[in-house]
């Protein structure tokens, strides 16, 4: 039986995103970063496919169910096995509650599976997050996306659609993160300045750039409508991140703390100046993005918008 008496307020992040986006690396980096700031951090691994974890794990779903056991026992593939594992966890939430009760006055990082369908179409993960909220967790969904997708307009529109769908389905305060900023131009230069992608500015320019490709020109009407849906909701924006960069990590942390209310919570002493700074957004997002662009983008290459201005 799950307790009807919820514990005191607890804060944390649920780290989601497609496979290979850097969720586990982010959890390890954020744990080290928060520990240096004096926060007591607990990592909860909710990914049954995670093996050889690079961080100390306080709660591990592998004690309850593993993907290999599910695939072998039920003859399921990787996707079906992950869905079954999440349904099994949902049916055994008392196990998770008892594990979490052992950790008091901690900040929680939940390392989640990478299957996109779990956050856009299936309800088990959504229900697990909802139950965590009932247990007095104040969580922010940190959705990691590979930054190099910005170099491909078609992939970036797909990323925007996935991010929007996830935000609407998961129903948590949401921070979208462009991860691996040090590799952003690995597969080609960006067509626009970085703030165009982080703030998701006028997508009609991106659609025009996409229609220059003969293949995608055939799908121009579809791309226009997808861009309209994204901009009509006006929900998606991104925070750039390089886990090795302390300033970048601090920017993400500030955004997350505002989203879940940690900066106004009672887990540690916060002075009035820090709270007011968070409330008015005194970290100036534009200046931060400009600094990231200067650090990671090749300044010798002209962007499309620069070339247009030169005409």
From Swiss-Prot:
GTP binds at residues 20-25, 179-182. A motif (Gly-Pro-Asn (GPN)-loop) lies at residues 77-79. Keywords: GTP-binding, Hydrolase, Nucleotide-binding. GO terms for molecular function: GTP binding; GTPase activity. The keyword Transmembrane helix does not apply. It holds the Pfam family ATP_bind_1. Signal peptide: none annotated. The keyword Protease does not apply. CDD domains: GPN2 (cd17871). It comes from the Eukaryota. The record marks 79 as: Stabilizes the phosphate intermediate. InterPro entries: Gpn, Gpn2, P-loop_NTPase. Heterodimers with gpn1 or gpn3. Binds to RNA polymerase II (RNAPII). Belongs to the GPN-loop GTPase family. Small GTPase required for proper localization of RNA polymerase II and III (RNAPII and RNAPIII). May act at an RNAP assembly step prior to nuclear import. This is GPN-loop GTPase 2.
